C-alpha cells in the first residue's frame, strides 16, 4: 500500500500571486530578513536554498500570517488561497480530538466519510481515523497535515521541509503530487532529487541578499552567472549550494 497525494485547487489562480516589498525581520538581535523584495507569478514552483534555514522559515511564517514583519509588506492576489506546511507542526494538534474531527474543521462537506477518504489516501484506515491527535507520532502528524492540505483544495502551497519525517514511499507520493500540482508552490527541502524535480525557480539566501534564477536546481548548480554572484556574495568562502 502506498500513500496517494494529489492537490487539486478549487479555483484557478489569477495573474497576481504574491508581491513582497522591502521585508525585514530581526529576531534576538539577528537580522534574519533584510529588505527582501520578490514577486511570485502563476505557474512558479520556487525552491528556497542557502545556509540560512532560519530565514526561509521566518519568511514562510510571515507570508502565511503567523508572524509580523518589522518593516515592509506582502500582498497576496485576490484569487489566491493558501495552505501552509510548517517545519514544526506540533502546535497544530491538541489532545482530546481525533483525526477525523480535526479534519472536519477544514472540510466544506459535513460528512465524515468524505473526510476519512483523505485520511485513507495517507493510509489511515478504519478505526485509525479515530486516533487521538495528541498521541500521533511525528510521521503520522505529517500525514494528517498532508491530508488536511489535500482537503482544503487551495491553489498556493508553502512547504517548510516536508520530507523530514516521511518514509521513502511517502516522499515519492508527495513528490509526484507536487509535480502534478497546477498551482503555485513555495518550498524548501534537504532532498536534492525532490528540489530538482519540482522547482522551476531557485532563490538562494546569501550573506549579501538573494540570488534569484528561473531554472531547475541542477542547472542552477552549473550556471556560470550564479557562480560569479555566489563568489561575490560569500566573498570567496562559498562551498556547495546548501539545501
Which positions does each model-derived feature cover?
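Short, flexible cytosolic linker that couples an ABC transmembrane/permease module to its adjacent nucleotide-binding
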Residues: 1-11
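ABC ATP-binding cassette signature C-motif
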Residues: 10-243
Amino acid at each position: 500500500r502506498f500513500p496517494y497525494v494529489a492537490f487539486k485547487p478549487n479555483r484557478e489562480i489569477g495573474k497576481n500571486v504574491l508581491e513582497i516589498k522591502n521585508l525585514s525581520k530581526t529576531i534576538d538581535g539577528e537580522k534574519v530578513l533584510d529588505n527582501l523584495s520578490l514577486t511570485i507569478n502563476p505557474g512558479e514552483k520556487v525552491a528556497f536554498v542557502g545556509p540560512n534555514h532560519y530565514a526561509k522559515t521566518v519568511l514562510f511564517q510571515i507570508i502565511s500570517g503567523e508572524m509580523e514583519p518589522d518593516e515592509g509588506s506582502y500582498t497576496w492576489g485576490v484569487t489566491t488561497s493558501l495552505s501552509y506546511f510548517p517545519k514544526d507542526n506540533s502546535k497544530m494538534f491538541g489532545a482530546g480530538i481525533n483525526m477525523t474531527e480535526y479534519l472536519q474543521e477544514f472540510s466544506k462537506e459535513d460528512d465524515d466519510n468524505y473526510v476519512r477518504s483523505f485520511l485513507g489516501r495517507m493510509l489511515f484506515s478504519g478505526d485509525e481515523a479515530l486516533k487521538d491527535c495528541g498521541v500521533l507520532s511525528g510521521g503520522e502528524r505529517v500525514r494528517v497535515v498532508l491530508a488536511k492540505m489535500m482537503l482544503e483544495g487551495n491553489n498556493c502551497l508553502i512547504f517548510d521541509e516536508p520530507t523530514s519525517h516521511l518514509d521513502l514511499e511517502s516522499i515519492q507520493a508527495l513528490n509526484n503530487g507536487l509535480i502534478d500540482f497546477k498551482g503555485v508552490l513555495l518550498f524548501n527541502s534537504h532532498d536534492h532529487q525532490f528540489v530538482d524535480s519540482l522547482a522551476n525557480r531557485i532563490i538562494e539566501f546569501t550573506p549579501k541578499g538573494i540570488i534569484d534564477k528561473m531554472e531547475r536546481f541542477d542547472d542552477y548548480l552549473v550556471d556560470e552567472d550564479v557562480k560569479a554572484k555566489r563568489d561575490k556574495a560569500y566573498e570567496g568562502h562559498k562551498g556547495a549550494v546548501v539545501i
